[in-house]
Swiss-Prot record:
Pfam families: TatD_DNase (PF01026). Keywords: Hydrolase, Metal-binding. Its cofactor is a divalent metal cation. One of its GO terms (molecular function) is metal ion binding. A divalent metal cation 2 binds at E100, H136, H161. It comes from Buchnera aphidicola subsp. Schizaphis graminum (strain Sg). InterPro entries: DNase_TatD-rel_CS (IPR018228), Metal_Hydrolase (IPR032466), TatD-like (IPR001130), TatD/YcfH-like (IPR015991). SUPFAM superfamilies: Metallo-dependent hydrolases. GO terms for cellular component: cytosol. It comes from the Bacteria. This is Uncharacterized metal-dependent hydrolase BUsg_343.
Length: 264
């Protein structure tokens, strides 16, 4: 069985950042535990330019890891002068996606206009390079979809990661050719409506993720998340979709390689 964690932040695990030897030992443990749970590949998602450099330096020896390059909406103010550097870095062959980008009105409504500017620029770069975008949207789905449509984002496609929105929003995204990715939130007891939405998502547009080290699934909720826990998320999604775990693994793996135009 072959699972892919389509969104994680391996560099942000709760590990010793000051000792390089210990750092690599801890990463080895994290990845080996994931391998034991059939998680074979990982897309580690950058949240800032500084984060991208750090991640690439830290993880460059691991063939199982793919990279994205982007500036998270909450870091736009901090990296206000970095859009040109983002574009330059995005040409790197190791970068398979732009992001994560998008809008976050929950934590930073006051930077709404700046977030929108950065979001649009990510989309334009993605279209130019023919690379998908990874979208973060919190309390902002209406504006997120509006901008995607205005910027013709169907030309690059991408993922709405850690999806928690309505069925209506899901199908607006699907109509533009986007993929929908579900995280550990789908295992939470209160996620009844989200489970009902998942039932209606076409299998060919479905992806799975941990968003490690955040959003650990049940039975690990409250602990630091890690890619190994993708197996628990996959089991829950397979149950909801009424298919076998092996079938879900095959479908989501194929979807990942299709979206990012990668060879298996």
């Amino acid at each position: 069985m072959f699972l892919i964690d389509s969104h994680c932040h391996i560099d942000q695990m709760n590990i010793d950042q000051k000792n390089d030897d210990l750092l690599h030992q801890e990463i080895e443990k994290i990845l080996n535990k994931a391998y034991e749970n059939h998680v074979k590949k990982f897309l580690t998602v950058s949240t800032s330019i500084q984060n991208f450099y750090k991640t690439k330096k830290l993880l460059s020896t691991y063939d199982s890891i793919f990279y994205s390059c982007g500036i998270h909406p909450l870091y736009c103010q901090k990296e206000i002068e970095c859009l040109n550097e983002l574009k330059k870095l995005s040409y790197d062959k190791c970068v398979i996606a732009l992001g994560e980008t998008g809008l976050d009105y929950y934590y930073s409504f006051e930077t709404k206009n700046l977030q929108e500017k950065f979001f649009r620029e990510h989309i334009r770069i993605a279209i130019t390079l023919n690379k998908p975008i990874i979208i973060h949207s919190r309390n902002a789905i209406k504006d997120t979809i509006k901008i995607l449509k205005e910027e013709n984002a169907e030309k690059c496609g991408g993922i709405l990661h850690s999806f928690t929105e309505s069925e209506k929003s899901a199908f607006e995204l699907l109509d533009m050719g986007f993929y929908i990715s579900f995280s550990g939130i789908i295992t939470f007891k209160k996620s009844i409506e989200l489970c009902n939405t998942l039932k209606k998502i076409p299998l060919e547009k479905l992806l799975i993720e941990t968003d490690s080290p955040y959003l650990a699934p049940i039975p690990y909720r409250g602990k630091k998340n890690q890619p190994a826990y993708l197996l628990d998320i996959a089991k829950k999604i397979a149950l909801i979709k009424e298919i076998s775990l092996k079938e879900l693994a095959k479908i989501t793996t194929n979807n990942f390689f299709t979206l990012f135009n990668l060879n298996f």
